[in-house]
Amino acid sequence: MATAMQDVSPSFTSSPTSTMTTISTTTAATAAAAPKPDKPRKLRSACDACHRSKTRCSGGNPCTRCHEYMSPCTYSYSSRCGKPKGARSRKTLEREQRVAAAAESARIAGNPSALASLPATSTCTSTATTAAAAAAATTTTTIATTTAPSQGPAVDSAAAAAAATTSTVASPRADDCLGLFDDDEESNPFFSSGSENTGGTSFSPDWIPPLPSISDSDLSFPLLESCLGPDHDCNDSLFWSTTAEPDCQPTSKEPLDPRSKLLRSCKCLQTLSSLTARDIRRFDATFVFVRNYARAFSAFYHCSHCPKDAGSISMAVTALQLATTALEKTATAGTDAAGFKSGCSGMTAADLDEDLLTPGAEFFLPANGRGASNPAFQLGSYQIAPLPGEPDLEEHSEILNILIRSAVRRLLAVCWQIWDLLRGPASRDGRGHVFEPYDPSSSSSSSSSSFSSGPEIHQLCDLSCSAEAAQFRSTLVQIPARLCNLLAL
């Protein structure tokens, strides 16, 4: 007897996995062989008459409605349509397979030693896929019982990698329906690090307003110190982003004088001209105006049909001055809101006409004197204002600071593009133009070139000696300085 026990005990304890597999297989076979008892069908809680008329039934036989109308009160069985409970569709299985494949690739990328076991991993993946399809058909759970204990940590790590991948892909600005931000701003050091001399704060996506990150064709303006310095890299992706040539054709094939027929020459000029005649009535419209102007000028800059003459560039500079003035008023609204509110009553109609805020404008001023440093701003359907009882909330100024920095970046990029257009014909890329009377050859320019070296402020004095160029030169020297002053507010 003792010998028999010694022979049986080792064989019983040596293969727990095979024993669990046998038990699971037997249980699954028994469950599959035994037919499931049909659940008793339930009667509707409403009678047939109330069900057809879609009215509330009081229940009973007869119900109140059938008793009132003296009609027969009968109850029928409810008919259930659709898939049975727990069934999964083909698209659900495909989505789960894609998630599992992404988790596996993330695990392999994070663990280089796993590359040696790639065939085994592929086998496990295909086995898991086949098992998932079988589970959807038979709704049994024998796969979970037959899984080896050593595969548990691998499955947990794959699930964790899938969760990390999903959280990484999610954008903190998925609801930026106004497109006030760019995709490259998050990785730009100009917005990702604070500046001591400008008083800027660190760029943190945790408190950014839920304003898609719509990728537009604006040029990315890099860090100011790196641009104006001698060691900047113009081939960096943060310096200029590649922009495709817009599909813009002239409305007429005959050569048009842009000075007399400006609006007939190109769609880009029409858009730019409409921006110069626009009146910015509200502070929150400033950021939208800057975005639209930067996009319109970028299309004009890269369009091969738009004439790059004095009239076109003068129109662009006018819109740039309008955007800069509006941005200055928006940036200083917090410090000057109290004085502006007290002085509105003494302003005349002429004063209001000269200001960007016209009498029909909706003034975005603080609700009380304590909130003078944090005026309310409305961006689309989002209201950015200090909470009641907390007028000195720092998040409001942080959000406004990020929006102002984004607008400054766009306008500085426009300044650099205008400088590129003002360069002489001896420039390295051939995009420069001389301000002479109308020259038909100036109506086309290369759209794929970009200047190879960043301009400096003192180089703006080397432009043409014409009156138009002198005026543009003085403006382009002043506007970047005004924009840089906004970063110190």
UniProtKB/Swiss-Prot annotation:
Swiss-Prot/TrEMBL keywords: DNA-binding, Metal-binding, Nucleus, Transcription, Transcription regulation, Virulence, Zinc
Cellular component terms (Gene Ontology): nucleus
Biased composition annotated in UniProt, kind: Low complexity: 9-20, 441-451
Residues of the DNA-binding region: 47-73
Pfam family, one: Zn_clus
Keyword Cytoplasm: no
PROSITE patterns membership: ZN2_CY6_FUNGAL_1, ZN2_CY6_FUNGAL_2
CDD domains associated with the record: GAL4
Induction per the UniProt record: Expression is induced by gliotoxin. Expression is controlled by veA. Expression is controlled by brlA and abaA. Expression is also regulated by rsmA. Expression is also influenced by SfaD and GpgA.
Main location: nucleus
Protein's GO biological process: mycotoxin biosynthetic process; positive regulation of gliotoxin biosynthetic process; regulation of secondary metabolite biosynthetic process
Stretch list, region Disordered: 1-20, 188-207, 432-451
Deletion phenotype: Impairs the expression of the majority of genes in the gliotoxin cluster with the exception of gliT.
Biased composition (Polar residues): 189-203
Physiological role: Transcription factor that regulates gliotoxin production and contributes to virulence.
The protein's name: C6 finger domain transcription factor gliZ
Highest classification ranks of the organism: Eukaryota, Fungi, Dikarya, Ascomycota, Pezizomycotina
